[in-house]
C-alpha cells in the first residue's frame, strides 16, 4: 500500500470517527435539552397553580374586607 493510500485511509477513518462522535454528542445534548424543557414546563405549571391560589386568596380577602367595611359603615350609620 502506498503512502498516499495510507494517508487517505487514515484521514477517512479519523473523519468517520469524528462524524460519529459528533452526532452522538449532539444527540445527547438534544436529549438533555428536551429533559430540561419538560422540567421547565413542570415548574411553570407549578408557578401558575401557585399564582392562581394566591389570586383566589386575594379575592377572598377582598370580599371579607368589603363585607367588614360595609358592616362597620352600617353600624356607624345606625349609631348616628
Curated annotation (Swiss-Prot):
Question: Mind telling me what this protein is named?
Answer: Protein PET117 homolog, mitochondrial
A single Pfam family, by name? PET117
Alphabetical GO biological process terms: mitochondrial cytochrome c oxidase assembly
| Species this protein is from | Danio rerio
Which GO terms of the cellular component aspect does the record hold?
mitochondrion
Say if the entry is tagged with keyword Transit peptide: yes
Q: Write out the entry's keywords from A to Z.
A: Mitochondrion, Transit peptide
The entry's family comment says: Belongs to the PET117 family.
> Residue range of the transit peptide?
1-22
Which InterPro entries does the UniProt record give?
Pet117
In its keyword annotation, does this UniProt entry include Chaperone?
no
Q: Where in the cell is it found?
A: Mitochondrion
Amino acid at each position: 500500500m502506498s503512502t498516499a493510500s495510507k494517508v487517505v485511509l487514515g484521514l477517512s477513518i479519523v473523519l468517520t470517527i469524528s462524524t460519529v462522535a459528533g452526532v452522538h454528542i449532539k444527540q445527547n445534548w438534544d436529549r438533555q435539552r428536551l429533559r430540561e424543557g419538560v422540567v421547565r414546563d413542570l415548574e411553570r405549571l407549578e408557578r401558575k397553580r401557585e399564582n392562581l391560589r394566591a389570586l383566589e386568596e386575594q379575592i377572598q380577602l377582598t370580599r371579607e374586607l368589603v363585607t367588614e367595611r360595609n358592616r362597620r359603615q352600617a353600624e356607624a350609620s345606625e349609631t348616628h
